[in-house]
Amino acid sequence: MATPEEKAKALEAALGQIEKQFGKGAIMKLGETQKLDIEAISTGSLSLDVALGIGGLPMGRIVEIFGPESSGKTTLTLSVIAQAQKAGKTCAFIDAEHALDPIYAAKLGVDVKELLISQPDNGEQALEICDALVRSGAVDVVIVDSVAALTPKAEIEGEMGDTHVGLQARLMSQALRKLTGQIKNSNCLVVFINQIRMKIGVIFGNPETTTGGNALKFYASVRLDIRRVGSIKNGDEVIGNETRVKVVKNKVAPPFRQVDFQILYGEGISRNGELIELGVKHKLVNKSGAWFSYEGEKIGQGKTNAMKWLAEHPEQAAILEQKLRSELLANPEKALLADLEAESESNISEVESDF
């Protein structure tokens, strides 16, 4: 029988062989804080950047963002484009759904004059355009919206009642086999937006699945499940959504982190709201009763007023964001512990309210 030392050596050898064959990050310990040194593009959400482990979405990789309708998928990708453009990167949007609103995109901070956009006629054309952009080496971010709208040419040219079994899945599988190597070589971030469908006849387990077959699940380095979990109201008026994102797959850092943030209509991700919440959680912003204070100065009674103060003082907001980003990305275990503490405190308060 093998000794513990021999088992440890055998495990180390096996892990080394796997990383040599499939690349660094193919396997890691769940609680491991080590991350790959990969360039990242911010998502526009500080908490999501921290949950991803490297400060955003990884360059040179494929990312899938999926969720139900009106959950914030396109808003999140437009936020990624806005952040990439601020960093001087070239972005392209392949609008297979033919539904991109340039006015809304501009409100989220996207420079629509510089954004490359294509509205292809069929799935083959969309993926050929994506391939050409990636191969050029001149485009840094490509968004495909969405996989469900990548309709094969044969289906478009056929009759309405014709059956085309597995056409879209085969199309995606072939395209990803071609794309994946070029994406790595050109250091381009390719984001596929996907929709959710229900599997028929599933009694046990999750009946939800994504469109386009299984190929994208395997080729994606990061998969984000985005959901709308509530509404934000100003009186009786709904002004935004409470959004939850779970990192269901992550090849560049430990997966399964979950974050909540707000998406405000016409504004996008509430950056100042996140700064207040994360600042309180990590002791950079003090909360006493309903009052919030930052560096000894009271900044507002209630979260809304504190957010207004940050909006009126962008320099202070930028400093607070930089402090949080550097502290949490340098110490991901601290961020995880703070999340667990906050969750336990909320559970305790729920139990107390029940009594």
UniProtKB/Swiss-Prot annotation:
**Does RNA-binding show up as a keyword for this record?**
no
Record's subcellular location: Cytoplasm
Q: Which SUPFAM superfamilies match?
A: P-loop containing nucleoside triphosphate hydrolases, RecA protein, C-terminal domain
Q: Which family does it belong to?
A: Belongs to the RecA family.
Major location, coarse class? cytoplasm
Which keywords fit this entry according to its UniProt record? ATP-binding, Cytoplasm, DNA damage, DNA recombination, DNA repair, DNA-binding, Nucleotide-binding, SOS response
The protein's GO terms of the molecular function aspect are: ATP binding; ATP hydrolysis activity; ATP-dependent DNA damage sensor activity; damaged DNA binding; single-stranded DNA binding
The UniProt function text for this chain reads:
Can catalyze the hydrolysis of ATP in the presence of single-stranded DNA, the ATP-dependent uptake of single-stranded DNA by duplex DNA, and the ATP-dependent hybridization of homologous single-stranded DNAs. It interacts with LexA causing its activation and leading to its autocatalytic cleavage.
Covalent S-S links between cysteines: none
Q: Name one GO cellular component term.
A: cytosol
Q: Where does ATP bind?
A: G67, P68, E69, S70, S71, G72, K73, T74
A biological process (GO) of this protein is: DNA repair
InterPro entries the UniProt entry points to:
AAA+_ATPase, DNA_recomb/repair_RecA, DNA_recomb/repair_RecA_CS, P-loop_NTPase, RecA-like_C, RecA-like_N, RecA_ATP-bd, RecA_C_sf
| Gene3D superfamilies (alphabetical) | P-loop containing nucleotide triphosphate hydrolases
Q: What name does UniProt use for this protein?
A: Protein RecA
Which organism is this protein's natural source? Answer: Histophilus somni (strain 129Pt)
